[in-house]
Amino acid sequence: PEGADAETVQKVLAVYKPYYTDHCQIKTAPYAGMLQQLDVLKEKYPIAIVSNKPDSAVKALCADFFPGYYALGEVSGCPRKPAPDMVYKAMEAIGAEKAIYIGDSEVDVITARNAGIPCLSVLWGFRDKADMEAVGAEYFCEKTENLATAIVKIADTF
């Protein structure tokens, strides 16, 4: 809760995290067309999913919606985004020396910058274009059906 002291925050998180892990599929589904775009991309690139959600929830959601992809959520000992550590861990796990980060928030743009990789900011998610431009976003994708094409264009630049 906003303005809460650290002890209250920890108490809330102690209740929330296990609840969310057990109920994370409620009102959650891939965006329309996303699975088809990932099918195109996985033919050419390894794919990993990195989230600040609890690791158990990320793995459960990925098992349901994105089976076969490496998934990493918040784990003890690995700093959360926007620190680059989770991105580096995912890149190592999938054997990627280069990467393009796909995100829908300012935190994602900053995470990619901290990791030294380009970020493709999608405009159907959490934040709007102005929010992401305010923190330096350069690449944008407006529709899920354009995702694979946008990734290939960025990949061709490095």
Model-identified regions with their sequence ranges:
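Short, acidic loop-to-helix structural element flanking the phosphoryl-transfer center
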Residues: 18-49, 55-62, 84, 144
